[in-house]
């Protein structure tokens, strides 16, 4: 049974790629057709590749992997934070700070500073400090939380990274490659799939599409952590939708 159905993908708009002039030719094999200047992703491949990604992530989680979700564009930020948290994992959803992986020791020092400021507030230190100093500390904490809050409790460099829009998150991809960390990603028609270890051809610009795929990756982690029986709630029957239905939906959406 497939993890995701063609119907779910269609309803979330996962099939809509970028304008044809903005494509990466390396994505040609994942493109079904072109409609009104827009590339349409081959969802039959996406169904299978979501299965592959799900199994990869599930297996990693079953082996106690640390998994980092990355998506800093506004369409991805909320889903990335929510689903990573639901799965008990970690996320970066504002801006990727250069060196997050390759200069982890420096990042750890910044995280330690964030925890130190939080502790100062908790133990009453703020109450005896001048208001001006407290204001500066709060400003520093807010900035650190914005960029590092999602990895504050990450115990080590991640074992797997899941990325929404690797075209935008190229620095994250490069750092992962340098350290040999496998990358699972939603790859739209404008991205380079050669950089990605586990590809999910998908529209990475629609909020519903991002939420759907990202939630499946979170489900995979939960299943990996709890065993197959616990995953029954997450598995939905995949209808045997035909390629003809894609044509009908695509033509309907573009008329």
Curated annotation (Swiss-Prot):
- Which Gene Ontology CC terms are recorded? cytosolic small ribosomal subunit
Instruction: List the GO biological process terms.
Output: translation
GO terms, molecular function: structural constituent of ribosome
Keywords assigned by UniProt? Ribonucleoprotein, Ribosomal protein
Q: Which family does it belong to?
A: Belongs to the universal ribosomal protein uS2 family.
Q: Which HAMAP family match?
A: Ribosomal_uS2_B
Q: What is this protein called?
A: Small ribosomal subunit protein uS2
Organism per entry: Streptococcus thermophilus (strain ATCC BAA-250 / LMG 18311)
What gene is behind this protein? Answer: rpsB
